Amino acid sequence: MSHYDIIHKPVISEKAYAGMERGVYSFWVSPNATKTDIKSAIQKAFDVTVVGISTMNVRGKRKRVGRFIGQRADRKKAIVRLAEGQTIAALEGQA
């Protein structure tokens, strides 16, 4: 699996932006990816050193369209902590 297949996109929220100041970044990742896969993909894609990873499975919300009820897909979120002093330049401009 390529690192492009593992990392879907960064999480965009106030909590995620607050973590960027401390070197903690959040990403939506493939539900099948392991912590080892995520670590190697982040290091390869952004050329940084990953110190720790926390992952969580986020259940999809139930949504209604008229009288029909559907459900969004379940997703996996990875919270990645980088080595001291390192940042991901591509995401710093968004904060």
Swiss-Prot record:
| Domain of life assignment | Bacteria
Q: Give the keywords, sorted.
A: Ribonucleoprotein, Ribosomal protein, RNA-binding, rRNA-binding
Q: Output the Gene3D superfamilies linked to this UniProt entry.
A: 3.30.70.330
A GO BP annotation: translation
Q: Which residues form the signal peptide?
A: none
Q: Name one GO cellular component term.
A: ribosome
Please give one Gene Ontology molecular function term for this protein: rRNA binding
Pfam families per record: Ribosomal_L23
Q: How does it assemble?
A: Part of the 50S ribosomal subunit. Contacts protein L29, and trigger factor when it is bound to the ribosome.
Q: Give the UniProt family note.
A: Belongs to the universal ribosomal protein uL23 family.
Question: What is the purpose of this protein?
Answer: One of the early assembly proteins it binds 23S rRNA. One of the proteins that surrounds the polypeptide exit tunnel on the outside of the ribosome. Forms the main docking site for trigger factor binding to the ribosome.
According to UniProt, the name of this protein is Large ribosomal subunit protein uL23
Natural source organism: Deinococcus deserti (strain DSM 17065 / CIP 109153 / LMG 22923 / VCD115)
Record lineage: Bacteria, Thermotogati, Deinococcota, Deinococci, Deinococcales
